[in-house]
Amino acid sequence: MRRWRWKMPATSTLAADVTQTVTAHVAGRVAQAFPRCRALILTGSAARQEATIARRPECVYWLSDLEFLVVVSDSENVGLTGEVLDELAATIGKDLRSQGLHIKLELTPAPERYFARIRPHLFGYELKRCGRQVFGDVNYLDRIPSFDWRSIPLDEAFRLVSNRLIELLELRLEQDRRSLAEQFYAVTKTYLDLLTALSLPAGSYAPGYQARFGARRAVLQWAVEQGCSLPASFLGNLEIAFQFKLDPDSRFHFLWVNGQQDLPAALEREGLRCFWDELPEAALAVWRWFASRLAGRSESCQEDPPHVYPVWARLRGWSRLLLHADPIPRLPLAARAVRLFPHGSPRSLVYSCGARLADPHAGAKEDSLAWVSRFLPLPTPNRHADWRELAEACVSIWRRHLRHSHA
């Protein structure tokens, strides 16, 4: 195959030019390496023209994920196909890095039937309105049912906030393996998605960070009036996050110092330490507010996990968890499912455990660790596990079973 050479765009519209060039390259590679692909669809921030791309002397850094849906036949084994596409994405990413573009590429298989079955949720809404089909004879985006964003259930916002909390745990576990810019982007994304989540019940949701940011003051005022206890610095931190999201080169040169992984120290030198320190408080305030609303009472403050999902969702969640579990631990996991079923679904329990562990003040205390050991859906929980062990287990379950699923 002809070796592809990366060329730096010379225009001021760096992100748009990089997105167009890389999308065309990925499309060619996927079509050649995976001929069973029936269509390729660009999703996420790149499709919304909101990719976070920084030009540095040594490299171009694509900090947000570059995400594609690879449409396959309904008869495909999605699990095996996913493994093949993961390898292909890694190969393409490695080739791009060798040409001066640091990027994380995701190729996710999507059976043809998937699109017609999409129900109202945030990803489906943005896919319908912002997704871009790169190639394919059938327009699969037209198959997505049309729905108003007001029909998106509140638990979608709760799911978004919960996923960002788990990613904060992931960041704390991997902090010494990520660059300053990668860490800062993870924090940035969390701030922006807290606004996304609140914009849904506030009646100001729109498919794009720029539109939601424009309504930020009204959304935050509404949230405070509704009892969501946000830190006083949240608005200022949100504005920092938005600036970095769309313009990571302007005032953030300190993030590109080689060999440094201590983001809190770097932020303190720049007078931005509260951007890091106050995020857990803000995220937990929003999480508890949504949990309370969904549970119908202030269960987030009680000993039992908040009951945010109905019984049918618990049944579906536990069934899928047991179905996809490894054979050896399946029996003890089934016994644990019986004990934990009254307390919630695997999703709600993982989210509740993640929220406990993410608390910077109480997360590592003995009673919090005991609580997480009690409710985390593991086959054989370790009653003496420390914070790191439990956080790693929580993140592992989320990655394997919950991250890309609604079950």
Regions found by a protein language model. Give the residues of each.
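Glycine- and acidic
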Residues: 6-12, 71, 175-177
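Residues at beta-strand starts and edge strands
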Residues: 64-66, 101-103, 186
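Conserved catalytic core of two-metal-ion nucleotidyltransferases
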Residues: 79-141, 160-167, 181
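Long, low-complexity intrinsically disordered regions
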Residues: 143-149
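Conserved nucleotidyltransferase catalytic core and NTase-mimicking acidic/glycine-rich helix/loop elements
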Residues: 149-407
